[in-house]
Amino acid sequence: ERDGDNVSVTDFAVLPHRKVLSTPDIDVAEVTRLSLGQLISEKDLEGEHLVISVPGHSAFARFAKLPPVEKKDLPEIVKFEAVQQIPFPIEEVEWDYEAFHQEGLPEVEVGIFAITRERVNERLDVYGEVGISPETLTLSPVSLFNAMNYDLNLSGAKDPVVFIDIGTQATDVIIATGDRCWIRTFPLGGTHFTEAIASTFKITYAKAERLKQEAASSKYAKQIMQAMRPVFADLL
């Protein structure tokens, strides 16, 4: 909840999916529906402003530096830039931007964020089937930056700060410099570590996933880490 300029967390829930969404042959929509059903059975969401995030690999984040421009002309110039940067016809995407102004410099840097309407509708359909109607959609790396910017007061930081968020299918790298950020998503995530374990030990994906999760306490920790080493090398 908000109290003036302060924000506090009043409640939260962690609801793991019944199966990892990268499990081969899984019905992602059905597993997601089951998790959402569990959420609404535990939390009263009626009347709440619902915000959902999409992973970085499902959307686009592009950054561009613009020449000095009057504030009133910025939206039109950014739209022109968005058409150049987004690899889909502009009428097929939902997009927005954030302008970053650096003190003492006339140039403006903008972050352009977009997702195809097809992907938006796919997600809204799944949410709608369980009676949830999100009002706002954002990108998970943007959410992470906003949270860390607030929690760590990055606007007062002198040096850049790097955040690495390893997801199931991809990894987001967020470089924050004060109130400005740069985001890049790489197609390497937790599923690649699981696949490496499955290949090394000739076991099923599900068993490999369990081994990965229990690696720290397993008597085979050394062998498991050895199996994942090539993926760590690619990530670094």
Question: Where are the predicted features?
Answer:
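Gly/Thr-rich phosphate-binding beta-strand-loop-beta motif of the actin/hexokinase/Hsp70
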Residues: E1-P16, L50-S53, D151-F193, I197
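Conserved phosphate/pyrophosphate-binding and hydrolysis machinery centered on Walker-type P-loop NTPases
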Residues: P67, T138, P187-G190, A221-M225, ...
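Small-residue helix-packing motif on alpha-helices
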Residues: L74, I203-L211
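Adenine-nucleotide phosphate-binding core of ATP-dependent small-molecule kinases
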Residues: A208-L236
